[in-house]
A protein has these predicted regions:
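Structured binding elements
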Residues: 166
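Anionic-ligand-binding alpha/beta catalytic cores of soluble enzymes and soluble regulatory domains
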Residues: 171-190
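Active-site-proximal beta-alpha core segment in soluble small-molecule metabolic enzymes
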Residues: 1-163, 172
Length: 190
């Protein structure tokens, strides 16, 4: 059902990649679209070998990942997971942006990341930003504004973007009476 509805698997481990494959999701890019993307801040040898073998786009959360991929598979499709310098979540544990977060390439290093993409002959597919889980619309609007500025930086570096992602983080009501997600409002922010 999820595959038929166009859901993309954002895997964060080799095990999740294998589960997605076992569930019928197809690796690689198809008409510019991927069923599976791998997101991390580092690559171990086994995961690196598997994403290269299957041509799974990698959402790179560190500069080292760009060098690792470029060394073994020039042309590999990548996303850049950018830390915009701010984060928000329903608790400190779910805040994945800002100076205290380990996640993502710091927004001020985007030009250097673009240079690494070019020097490693990688193919930039998109920009990704995830500031936390349990995010409200005010903070998501901040993400949208930050993303537009980052797109301008990438364009100024002569790289093409095919997609942008504000990540997840939408608050989900767990109990009756909690606010529901207004998807139309969320999309209107863009």
């Amino acid at each position: 059902l999820m595959k038929r509805q166009g859901v993309v698997v954002d895997s964060v481990s080799l095990g999740e990649i294998e589960r997605a494959l076992a569930s019928g999701f197809t690796p690689g890019l198809h008409n510019g679209h991927a069923d599976i993307v791998f997101t991390a801040d580092l690559l171990d040898r086994a995961t690196l070998a598997r994403v290269v073998e299957l041509n799974i786009p990698v959402n790179c959360g560190s500069m080292d990942m760009l060098d690792q991929l470029g060394a073994v598979n020039p042309g590999h499709p990548v996303w850049l997971r950018i830390n915009p310098g701010f984060g928000h979540g329903h608790s400190k544990k779910t805040n994945t942006g800002g100076e205290h977060s380990k996640h993502g390439i710091w927004h001020g290093d985007l030009v250097r990341a673009c240079e690494k993409i070019k020097s490693n002959s990688l193919t930039l597919h998109g920009l990704h930003m995830h500031i936390g889980s349990g995010v409200d619309y005010t903070h998501l609007q901040e993400v949208c504004g930050a993303m537009l500025k980052l797109v301008e930086v990438v364009n100024a570096q002569g790289l093409d973007l095919h997609a942008i992602s504000a990540g997840g983080g939408l608050s989900v009501p767990y109990q009756t009476g909690e606010p529901t997600i207004d998807i139309a409002h969320y999309f209107s922010l863009w």
